Amino acid sequence: MKVNCKGYPTKFCFGKPLPHCASDGKTYPNRCRFCNAFVKSHGLITLRYYGKCK
């Protein structure tokens, strides 16, 4: 799955909680946190699905 991470990273993350389960096995609480991690990983992590990782 793809997430639009244009404009990231950002210093502050606000917004509605919408958990993102990433390929690194971590649950990110919202798109902002996921996109910050995505950019930091140089695009190596991907979105597995929306929701908490199981």
From Swiss-Prot:
Pfam families: Kazal_1
GO annotation, cellular component aspect: extracellular region
Tissue expression profile of the protein: Expressed by the venom gland.
TM helices/strands, residue ranges: none
Superkingdom per UniProt: Eukaryota
Location relative to the cell: Secreted
Protein name as annotated: Kazal-type inhibitor-like protein
Organism whose genome encodes this protein: Bothriechis schlegelii
